A protein has these predicted regions:
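An acidic, low-aromatic, low-complexity terminal/linker signal
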Residues: 1-153
Length: 153
């Protein structure tokens, strides 16, 4: 069972390091989000689409009385669609470089577990948002760098 993770208003100490990651299902991929960047895991929020938005931007939702951009995690990582999710979630997380980070929502098919990922086991990815792939138990997960989100475009 997942516990609620709330780092409060101070925000996380963002950066790449070995440690705990939240594993989430995004289409057919399992992705690892740095736990210290995760603020909350919620049942999927109601999303209001924005006309003309890119496919990755599902729209806006309300979180804490404020608008929250919701990104489609499966599209961001190029995952093939998976089965229809039984328990879709929105992961509220800090993204972007530390000096300009902002709160975003990531729409995912399921929150799976918290796991430790050794960065020495990460096989290089694109060097940006997808840090690389690493074995976690019996599966290979895509390790994500939320600091790089939004800097690649």
């Amino acid at each position: 069972m997942l516990r609620s993770v709330d780092h409060g208003g101070a925000g996380p100490r963002i950066g790449l390091s070995a440690g705990s990651y939240l594993l989430v299902q995004a289409g057919e991929y399992v992705c690892a989000l740095p736990l210290r960047s995760v603020r909350r895991v919620l049942r999927a929020l109601t999303v209001h689409p924005l006309p003309g938005a890119t496919a990755e931007l599902k729209g806006l939702a309300e979180f804490g009385g404020e608008p929250l951009p919701i990104l489609d995690l499966a599209r961001l990582v190029g995952a093939p669609p998976g089965a229809n999710p039984s328990y879709p979630v929105t992961i509220v997380a800090w993204a972007g470089p530390e000096e300009g980070r902002e709160l975003i929502g990531l729409a995912a098919d399921a929150a799976l577990e918290v796991a430790d990922v050794a960065l020495s086991s990460v096989v290089a990815g694109d060097g940006g948002f997808i840090l690389g792939e690493a074995p976690v138990g019996e599966q290979v997960v895509r390790v994500l760098n939320l600091e790089a989100l939004g800097q690649e475009r």
